[in-house]
Amino acid sequence: MAVADPIARLVKELAKLPGIGEKTAQRLAFHILKAGAGYAGDLAAAIAGVVRDVRLCSTCQTLTDQDPCAICRDPERDARMICVVEGVPDLLAVERTHEFRGRYHVLHGALSPLDGVGPSDLKIRELLVRLEREPADEIVVATNPDVEGEATALYLTKLLKPMGLKVTRIAQGVPMGGDLEYADQVTLARALAGRREL
């Protein structure tokens, strides 16, 4: 027996989400149906609101509904220390440690020549423009400890060291090939505390 076309369309769209296969998409679709029109409307409104209202912070490139974002507006943050991360989930992981009181810069990826991702595909130019406008003392490179993250860290070091900046790398403690997003808070806090100069 085939499912109704509207259900099939919903399953097809949900299955496009990362980590969601067809069976999980089908379970989610039936959950939405069971929850009722109110829930479905709220979910649709939340999705539409994210697409409509969320944009990049003009300073750090994180996702925000206000520009500049809350972290960039916070006068208690050390504006002279910038933690460079690959993505917003990495920023959130570092924030959960409550160990870093500087500001951030989100690259939105890592260098990956095999995948066709070069420096111009990342928010590196925006970082350089930001540093001209707002000088910093230290750049903490917190890219993932994998081949792409290491390549990105080395590339950033070669760009930033000649500018007279102290460039540090978070200490290894996060396993090689792992993502910051999935690291526990203690491991990530130790990695931040043990960062090293590049």
UniProtKB/Swiss-Prot annotation:
What Pfam families does the annotation carry? RecR_C (PF21175), RecR_HhH (PF21176), RecR_ZnF (PF02132), Toprim_4 (PF13662)
The record ties this protein, via InterPro entries, to:
DNA_Rcmb_RecR (IPR000093), Hlx-hairpin-Hlx_DNA-bd_motif (IPR003583), Rcmb_RecR (IPR023627), Rcmb_RecR_Znf (IPR015967), TOPRIM_dom (IPR006171), TOPRIM_RecR (IPR034137)
GO terms in the biological process aspect are: DNA recombination; DNA repair
Indicate yes or no for the key word Zinc-finger: yes
Q: Where are the zinc fingers (C4-type)?
A: 57-72
Q: What sequence ranges are listed for the domain Toprim?
A: 80-175
> Which superkingdom, per the lineage?
Bacteria
- Gene Ontology molecular function: DNA binding; zinc ion binding
Is the Phosphoprotein keyword given for this protein? no
Q: What residue intervals traverse the membrane?
A: none
Query: What is the similarity comment for this entry?
Result: Belongs to the RecR family.
What HAMAP family does this protein map onto? RecR (MF_00017)
Against PANTHER family, the record matches this protein to:
RECOMBINATION PROTEIN RECR (PTHR30446:SF0)
Output the NCBIfam families linked to this UniProt entry: recR
What protein name does the entry list?
Recombination protein RecR
List the gene name: recR
